């Protein structure tokens, strides 16, 4: 037996999505295109003022009107879901997140659970949440399912220290090794 998975370490990282920060569409542009493709009156001037990503959707010959409307409704749903005012065109499920250098980028939050002793990956979870605050229960559940055992210890950095994480660990009877905030 290689390991007992006695101690599992949790961490998250922000990974840039396949989308430029400039390749985004705004709420207003989405609504203009939806109005246009649904047959409502839209001025030529408004269509000409669309930024390049919105123009590409408007002019795309490979998509029929129904596909464009479906894409635009999906984008509109992302505005509602995220509260953000811009959505990436190439990857509408990615989110603006703060990177390690403090810059904002279109990205995903990747959570990992790794066996402390052997460095074997127990679980990976890709999320749209821009911070790690409430990710501990999800990634630990995935790890327990994958390794088919409950670790005795879970270690994580300070960002995971909150009532939700602590209650989860207490309910599971797992010792949490999470430092206090400074």
Give the positions of each predicted feature:
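Polybasic low-complexity intrinsically disordered regions
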Residues: 1-174, 179-181
């Amino acid at each position: 037996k290689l390991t007992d998975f006695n101690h599992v370490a949790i961490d998250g990282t922000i990974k840039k999505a396949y989308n430029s920060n400039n390749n985004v569409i705004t709420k207003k542009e989405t609504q203009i295109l939806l109005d246009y493709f649904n047959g409502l009156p839209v001025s030529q001037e408004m269509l000409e003022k669309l930024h390049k990503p919105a123009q590409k959707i408007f002019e795309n010959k490979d998509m029929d009107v129904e596909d464009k409307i479906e894409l635009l409704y999906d984008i509109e749903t992302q505005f509602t879901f995220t509260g953000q005012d811009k959505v990436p065109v190439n990857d509408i499920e990615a989110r603006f997140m703060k990177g390690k250098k403090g810059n904002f980028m279109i990205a995903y939050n990747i959570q990992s659970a790794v066996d402390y002793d052997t460095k074997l990956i127990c679980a990976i979870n890709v999320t749209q949440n821009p911070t790690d605050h409430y990710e501990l229960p999800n990634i630990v559940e995935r790890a327990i399912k994958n390794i088919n055992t409950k670790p005795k210890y879970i270690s994580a950095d300070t960002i995971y220290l909150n009532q939700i994480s602590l209650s989860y660990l207490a309910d599971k009877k797992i010792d949490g090794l999470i430092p206090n905030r400074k």
